[in-house]
Amino acid sequence: MGVFRFISISLAAVSAANAAQILSMPHAQTVPNSYIVMMKDDTSDDDFNHHQSWLQSTHTHNITRRATIQNAGMRHKYNFSKMKGYSGIFDEETIKDIAKDPKVMFVEPDTIISVHGKVEQSNVPSWGLARISNPQPGAGSYIYDSSAGEGITVYSVDTGVDVNHEDFEGRAIWGSNQVNDGDDRDGSGHGTHTSGTMVGKEFGIAKKAKLVAVKVLGNDGSGPTSGIVAGINWSVEHARQNGGTKKAVMNMSLGGSSSSALNRAAAQAVEQGMFLSVAAGNDNQDAQSSSPASEPSVCTVGSSAEDDSRSSFSNWGPAIDLFAPGSNIISARPGGGSQSMSGTSMAAPHVAGLAAYLMALEGISGGAVCDRLKELGTSSITDAGPGTPTNVLINNGGA
């Protein structure tokens, strides 16, 4: 289970012989009294409904006796085709009762996930677009096929998006707000920036793709894992009902401590046909300790600088699939105009945008997209980092 260990303090070990694991997140920032519960893979819809009815009764009984937690109860319900679960605010006794249900796989404390980008100076030269369509650094033009991602939908699972920004030309819509803050806008600027790189007319790679904003992080750039999982679930269902998951891309320029729940949700999205681009993280350390970057089925992206070196902040290691421009990237700013940001958060949308572009151009989908990106890329990155299996920088093959 990697960094996980059994809780041995206040929650105690569940005495039932077949009790589910109650995982601990010793190196993560946890949300007080908030948990994610994952059911076993063979849980039927009837089993899940029965468990929810039982949970409501049990939770009500426990809270009535103690009344120690405010606003408690289920918050999100997850229902992928092969993964069921939920999250909520529960007291310790309820968590121990949940773990005793033989249909529960594990219980995981909810943790804080954050963006992988930071604002730097404004008005620096833009270079990322030119770099991904030319074999050498220093070019000044972006060469691309006129199909430009048409027919593909990109899901920005982020801080929200200014869908009215002129660079989106009306191709961006608001989808879902899992933060539940009543603020359907991008108060951070992070999500608008990453989205501009993916689909913007001026700043973007897939200039004809559509974009759906899925807000899972607040205006401070952080949010609970439970909301991220809910955002993934919502995106998969929306894609399934609107053109199909095989014509959908998801970008996740975010991450936090290793989470089985988050990795399983990301894997479910890939299994159902979506392509997922994930930021490796900005801690100059092994990305294997971060989620969702450590999930093997996603395309995990490290950041490169303008001279084709690995960005000094970029994570590295066996989880890395590709590198993409991430230092000093110019893209859209909420309210209009542009700004510069750096981070693996800026690298991942280059991959997501190029994925949408290739899906429209070549008709590929899902896991085949990451493989195709590796084929088209150039072996350009210097100092890819310890244990990193690739030095490939993405390229569109010169259109």
UniProtKB/Swiss-Prot annotation:
Enzyme class name: hydrolase
Residue stretches making up the Inhibitor I9 domain: 34-115
Signal peptide positions on this chain: 1-19
Any single GO CC term annotated in Swiss-Prot or TrEMBL for this entry: extracellular region
Catalytic site positions: 158 (charge relay system), 190 (charge relay system), 345 (charge relay system)
GO biological process: proteolysis
Pfam family, one: Inhibitor_I9
Biased composition, class Polar residues, residue ranges: 282-294
Annotated ranges, domain Peptidase S8: 126-399
Main location: secreted
Sites where a glycan is attached: 251
EC numbers for this chain: 3.4.21.-
Annotated segments matching region Disordered: 175-198, 282-312
Residue runs in coiled coils: none
SUPFAM superfamilies reported for this sequence: Protease propeptides/inhibitors, Subtilisin-like
Gene Ontology molecular function: serine-type endopeptidase activity
Location(s), subcellular: Secreted
UniProt propeptide residues: 20-116
Family from the record: Belongs to the peptidase S8 family.
Entry function: Secreted subtilisin-like serine protease with keratinolytic activity that contributes to pathogenicity.
Record protein name field: Subtilisin-like protease 1
Originating organism: Trichophyton verrucosum (Cattle ringworm fungus)
Lineage: Eukaryota, Fungi, Dikarya, Ascomycota, Pezizomycotina
Designated gene of the protein: SUB1
